[in-house]
């Protein structure tokens, strides 16, 4: 196994031109739209391959194991995202802090932040792994997963959570690289790991007939490969962000700064999952077929959220470096440019998926009822994608400046509270699937409005604009 990892690292090393090619990017100077797009696209493609882990699981499980297995895997999505999103938020905190130090050219603080971040990844990964192993069944039962798929869903979730430590390490490691403007190496590693995932999915599920357990194990192996590759890269780097394993420890002042930004960012991300879990509970009441249809829709819908997450990560890093360099006018120009890019992507994806979504649906299931119901959801929800863009861009801009608490509050009110209130008090009067999921565009519009209002005050306080 170890020689395989060494070969993969050497292959990536030569593909990217080795250490002689400087993959870092200084966002404090240059053409803004070009910098954002060149940084954005590797993140987007990388997000696609990361999503491919679970998507390939779903396709192979749906085709090889049937509708019940598909529903079992799909029913775990919101709970796994709840935990995963929190450590992604922590990695955002690390990325912002390192980006600010990088923009300020503070080498000592970069060194401390890198090693503190890795220690945080290890500790948080252990905690989340233990949580998943011991409480998966109870959590799935609490959200109303039907008993005919509960055992399979619990098995998949427990095996998935075995990968929390390598998952946390990869997210922190890639966050470090992105903080210094390198979004290409994380992409290369994800491509390799996606290939590993597909191969092991085929072997374990199709050939060895290990069912959903095989799919979860394949994902675990792929996540481990990702963690090893990004760690090797950081260890052999000659730049200021080089990782030394013996120096991994907490530096308390830096840790406090990372947690101050990362914890609210993580909580903000988990709020989406909490609201979605509440909605999933109501969706589960419509039966196994609807659960399967919704799980397929969520996989297609993920294309939009990958794009938003990528542009959000791009503007956060851009702002972080410029905030560290005190270039406030450039920050405002970057936010406007990122918003224009986000709106263009939202409208384009809405059109493409509304017209071509049915073809993608057929990749996941051959059941006509699932295909028709999923297409109905696509036409009902996706035209409203544009209404979310302000949330991602303004939130990323504020976070890059070190302000993470206020965006969390706005998301709590506009997404979590409002969405839960809708399904609790309004949707029971309209007992259909659409009566539940219409809460999505309603909360997108509302939260964007809240961010627009607050961002005007934020600019005056931070930039004097």
Give the ranges of each region predicted by the language model.
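Small-residue-rich hydrophobic transmembrane alpha-helices
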Residues: 2, 70-130, 167-186, 293-357, ...
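Hydrophobic transmembrane alpha-helices of multi-pass small-molecule transporters
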Residues: 82-85, 197-202, 227-231, 303-306, ...
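N-terminal transmembrane alpha-helices
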Residues: 27-64, 78-93, 97, 122-129, ...
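Transmembrane helical elements of multi-pass membrane transporters/channels
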Residues: 38-57, 159, 170, 193, ...
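Short alpha-helical transmembrane segments in multi-pass integral membrane proteins
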Residues: 1-40, 98-163, 207-263, 319-384, ...
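Short runs within selected transmembrane alpha-helices of multi-pass transporters and secretion channels
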Residues: 91, 160-178, 186-194, 215-230, ...
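Interfacial/gating helices of multi-pass transporter permease domains
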Residues: 61-81, 147-152, 212-213, 254-261, ...
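Helix-terminus/linker motif at the lipid-water interface of multi-pass membrane proteins
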Residues: 52-71, 140-147, 203-210, 270-299, ...
């Amino acid at each position: 196994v170890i020689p395989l990892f060494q070969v993969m690292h050497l292959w990536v090393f030569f593909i990217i031109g080795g250490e002689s090619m400087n993959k870092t990017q200084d966002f404090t100077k240059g053409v803004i739209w070009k910098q954002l797009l060149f940084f954005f696209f590797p993140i987007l493609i990388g997000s696609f391959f990361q999503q491919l882990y679970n998507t390939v699981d779903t396709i192979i499980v749906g085709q090889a194991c049937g509708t019940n297995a598909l529903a079992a895997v799909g029913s775990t999505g919101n709970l796994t995202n709840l935990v995963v999103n929190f450590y992604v938020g922590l990695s955002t905190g690390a990325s912002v802090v390192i980006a600010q130090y990088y923009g300020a050219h503070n080498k000592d603080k970069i060194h401390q932040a890198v090693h503190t971040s890795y220690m945080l990844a290890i500790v948080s990964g252990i905690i989340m792994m233990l949580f998943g192993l011991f409480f998966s069944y109870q959590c799935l039962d609490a959200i109303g997963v039907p008993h005919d798929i509960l055992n399979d869903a619990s098995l998949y979730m427990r095996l998935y959570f075995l990968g929390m430590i390598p998952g946390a390490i990869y997210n922190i490691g890639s966050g470090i690289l992105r903080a210094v403007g390198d979004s290409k190496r994380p992409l290369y590693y994800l491509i390799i790991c996606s290939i590993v995932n597909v191969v092991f999915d085929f072997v374990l599920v199709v050939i060895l007939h290990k069912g959903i357990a095989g799919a979860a194990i394949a994902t675990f192996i792929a996540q481990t490969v990702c963690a090893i590759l990004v760690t090797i890269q950081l260890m052999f780097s000659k730049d200021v962000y080089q990782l030394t394993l013996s120096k991994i420890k907490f530096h308390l002042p830096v840790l406090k700064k990372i947690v101050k930004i990362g914890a609210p960012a993580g909580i903000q991300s988990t709020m989406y999952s909490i609201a979605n879990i509440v909605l999933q509970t109501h969706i589960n009441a419509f039966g196994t077929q609807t659960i399967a249809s919704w799980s397929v829709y969520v996989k297609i819908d993920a294309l939009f959220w990958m794009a938003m997450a990528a542009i959000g990560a791009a503007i956060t890093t851009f702002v972080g470096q410029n905030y560290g360099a005190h270039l406030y006018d450039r920050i405002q120009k970057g936010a406007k440019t990122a918003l224009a890019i986000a709106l263009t992507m939202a409208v384009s994806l809405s059109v493409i998926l509304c017209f071509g979504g049915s073809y993608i649906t057929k990749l996941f299931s051959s059941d006509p009822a699932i295909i028709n119901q999923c297409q109905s959801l696509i036409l009902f929800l996706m035209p409203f994608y544009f209404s979310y863009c302000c949330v991602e861009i303004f939130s990323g801009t504020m976070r890059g400046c070190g302000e993470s608490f206020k965006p969390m509050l706005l998301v709590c009110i506009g997404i979590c509270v409002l969405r839960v209130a809708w399904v609790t008090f309004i949707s029971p009067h309209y007992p259909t699937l659409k009566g539940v999921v219409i809460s999505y565009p309603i909360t997108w519009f509302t939260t964007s409005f809240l961010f627009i209002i607050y961002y005007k005050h934020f600019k005056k306080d931070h930039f004097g604009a």
